[in-house]
């Protein structure tokens, strides 16, 4: 009995129960690795019937403004520190980005033609018949240049970048990140003001985290998927 009591006293006072796990330290001499996470926002619903320059007309409809406010609130609620906000030069993208910028006023909105809507090569014959070889080549060159500019490893710290652009642009970027034939970009759709998230690791590898996530938009406010709304639209 005396031996048992002595043993228990040792365990409680300074033995097994009192022992702290050893701190786990990263190996010395190993450089930290950072990631870049890119949040691709498709613009909101817009006036497709308007005629004229896309940088002047074809602005957001009331539905599109409501969608923009919803995605802005989604972004504002994320537990990350956003580091940049870029948008296409087209009116509908600039207006959507402006709403996002109001929700995230610490960011400086940058406008770039690299994110403009365009039509790159696709397997769809019905789409290709209306395009010229020069136009297709220009679109592909633009999107490849945009991908090379924005989808690069982070330096110094984790980066969280928002790109407000267009459906064709976003889908092309997804095919590039997945390493599949970029002509497959018409094989899926992304809703207006949906979120597509792609991460770039320290070695230049890509991981697609989300495609066309529209969970922040009620079903009756969804658009841009090529189908009718499931319920009458009521502005929030």
Regions found by a protein language model. Give the residues of each.
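Active-site-proximal alpha-helix that buttresses catalytic centers in soluble enzyme cores
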Residues: 20-112, 131-136, 140-145, 226, ...
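Bacterial N-terminal signal peptides
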Residues: 5-15
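GST superfamily/GST-like fold recognition
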Residues: 169-171, 207
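Active-site metal-binding loops of divalent metal-dependent hydrolases
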Residues: 44, 167, 214
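Generic beta-sheet signal
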Residues: 38, 157-165
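Acidic, low-complexity terminal tails and accessory targeting/binding regions
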Residues: 17-35, 117-128, 157, 176-236
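Active-site signature of alpha/beta-hydrolase-fold catalytic machinery across serine-
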Residues: 99, 172, 176
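Glycine-rich phosphate-binding loop signature in dinucleotide/nucleotide-binding domains
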Residues: 78-80, 152-159
